[in-house]
């Protein structure tokens, strides 16, 4: 017997996930994806009764479930008491949530964003979205612009590669010597993040991929 999967909240990534699961033969329902055309939309109580719940990435933002595709708000404290301990719960960026949910509600929330392949795949639309914002904010093309990427994590790597493909002059800053060695090996100008200062004014566009400088 097939288990019911409920995709609850999130953005167009979750809409696409629901469609893929349907195509693979799963019994799928959705809630909170109405503005994105989420398939098989059902009332919240019905969605929360599914054996498997897939929650957004990140699960919560500002104290509530991440719900950019609906006008309905759902506070996290309204959600957790309505779930069962025997449900399989999947969500993204759950490290701060998981211990408290187990302690307070007996729930186990697994973090699909712990998987490296998910983080790398997520870096692609993030990097391309950043480039789109830069294009919209500048009056000239990015070709030949001096671009600085701060940080050489997953997003920084993809971003530098995409910018190179657009013909920009790419510099990348990182804290670790090993990262700066790789930056230079790939043909970008390496800079030390902790030494960025007056030279920031030399760049036409700056992309920051680190949480804090």
State what each model feature region is.
Residues 58-62, 74-86, 186-213:
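Rossmann-like adenosine-cofactor binding region
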Residues 6-16, 21, 143-164:
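Glycine-rich adenosine-cofactor-binding loop
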Residues 1-5:
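Extreme N-terminal starter segment of soluble prokaryotic enzymes
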Residues 51-52, 88, 146, 205:
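Structural motif
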Residues 56, 136, 157, 173-178, ...:
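Conserved mixed alpha/beta catalytic, RNA-binding, or beta-rich assembly cores of soluble enzyme
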Residues 55-144:
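Glycine/serine-rich phosphate-binding loop and adjoining beta1-alpha1 elements at the start
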Residues 24-38, 166-186:
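NAD(P)-binding Rossmann-fold cofactor-contacting core
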Residues 11, 34, 93-95, 175-176:
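Residues in the short beta-alpha loop(s) of Rossmann-like NAD(P)-binding domains
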